[in-house]
Regions:
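Short conserved loop adjoining the S-adenosyl-L-methionine
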Residues: 1-2
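A conserved beta-strand element that flanks and buttresses the S-adenosyl-L-methionine
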Residues: 7
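Short catalytic micro-motifs in class I SAM-dependent methyltransferases
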Residues: 10-14
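Short N-terminal helix/helix-N-cap motif within the alpha/beta-hydrolase-1
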Residues: 16-20
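A short glycine-rich, Lys/Arg-flanked "PGG" loop and its adjoining helix->strand segment in the class I
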Residues: 21-36
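Conserved class I S-adenosyl-L-methionine
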Residues: 36-66
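Acceptor-substrate binding/catalytic loop of class I
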Residues: 55-72, 83-88, 106-111
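Conserved Class I S-adenosyl-L-methionine
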Residues: 80-145
């Protein structure tokens, strides 16, 4: 089976370099002529995601790794294009705290309950009732010719 579109959304960073390489090669080989591979990732610079101190440290470490991953991916996918999608986000502090408790972003996965609760206290102290920020996704687009 060949596909017209294959989309990978914010998951490549879960794989090691070898498995990422294999996945991208499999995706490329399973595209029809003029098929498109689209890979979404968080913007790696000037990220505005609301963070508590430990979360920011983990997020920045992950974004540095993601930056290297994106460069490597672009080298594998010759003649790619990169777009950025900007989303204005307005979320209540209480809703965001619920998301933190659910570990909505991968940099929170390895934090324990005590660390999350300490971070939530920081968020409560830092942010207003409504949290407004810009979320930016990078989109790498490769067309199989």
């Amino acid at each position: 089976i060949k596909f017209d579109l294959i989309m990978i959304k914010q998951t490549l960073h879960f794989f090691n370099k070898e498995k990422r390489t294999k996945l991208i090669k499999i995706c490329k080989s399973n595209l029809r002529k003029n098929g498109v591979l689209v890979i979404f990732s968080l913007n790696t610079i000037n990220n505005e995601i609301p963070c508590f101190k430990l979360m920011k440290q983990k997020l920045n470490r992950g974004l540095e790794r993601d930056s290297r991953m994106i460069k490597f991916t672009c080298n594998m996918l010759k003649d790619n294009t990169i777009d950025k999608f900007k989303f204005k986000v307005l979320i209540t502090k209480s809703k965001y705290i619920k998301m933190l408790k659910q570990k909505y972003i991968s940099c929170l996965v390895n934090l324990n309950k005590k660390q999350i609760n300490k971070g939530i206290k920081e968020i409560k102290d830092i942010y207003n009732k409504n949290i407004i920020f810009e979320d930016i996704l990078i989109c790498i687009k490769y067309k199989h010719i």
